A protein has these predicted regions:
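A structural signal for short, hydrophobic/glycine-enriched beta-strand patches
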Residues: 1-156
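Juxtamembrane/start-of-transmembrane alpha-helix segments at the extracytoplasmic/lumenal side
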Residues: 163-179
Length: 200
């Protein structure tokens, strides 16, 4: 939630908007919150600098979706009045990691190899894990979060926690192994002390 309350203040060239599931081929409230967060940042930047960033809508087509998420997101942003020429799409990704990998390619191709600055927009509960994936993809950018409806938040946080554990499973397995080994050592030491006590 840090990115929600303390959004980046720098001027950016690109905002990567992370996709999520469509409903009947349309942008549902959860995904709309992500696009709206990007639009708010872009509007604030335009007021301050007179320059609007490009939006990179990132999301492929799920097995149960009639079209790529990025296309629906682009349509939504344009309906909100954002210039069509400033809305790019990335339609190959299937998960957050791929969102950043493929969006980075889009930004690099569009910028023609010139240095650029970017941020990403996602749901507020998703900011931390998304930022970790951005770093792993070599995509250095901060994040801004869209509001998540209260009724959906408990489920979202639980899913996010599980995904975070899976993402860092090697670290957690190592910690679990160390704790288990220490527990066995402690138990063995106590058992040995108890044996000596009985022998006295």
């Amino acid at each position: 939630y840090v990115g929600k309350w303390f959004p980046p203040r720098k001027r950016v060239d690109y905002i990567v908007v992370l996709g999520s599931g469509l409903i009947d081929g349309k942008v549902p409230p959860l995904l709309a919150g992500r696009v709206d967060a990007a639009l708010r940042y872009a509007a604030r930047q335009k007021r301050k600098t007179g320059r609007e960033p490009c939006l990179i809508m990132s999301g492929g087509q799920g097995a149960d979706e009639p079209r790529p998420e990025a296309e629906a997101m682009r349509e939504y942003a344009m309906e909100k009045g954002y210039p069509a020429e400033l809305v790019l799409t990335e339609t190959q990704s299937k998960n957050t990691k791929e969102n950043f990998l493929y969006s980075k390619r889009v930004a690099e191709a569009h910028s023609e190899g010139k240095p650029y600055c970017c941020i990403y927009a996602t749901s507020d509960y998703h900011l931390l894990r998304a930022g970790l994936y951005a770093g792993r993809a070599g995509f250095s950018c901060d994040g801004v979060g869209g509001r998540t409806a209260g009724y959906y938040l408990p489920n979202a946080l639980l899913r996010e926690y599980i995904a975070y554990v899976v993402m860092n499973k090697k670290r957690y397995l190592t910690i679990a192994a160390v704790v288990f080994a220490l527990s066995l050592t402690l138990w063995g030491g106590l058992a040995l002390l108890a044996w000596f006590a009985r022998m006295l």
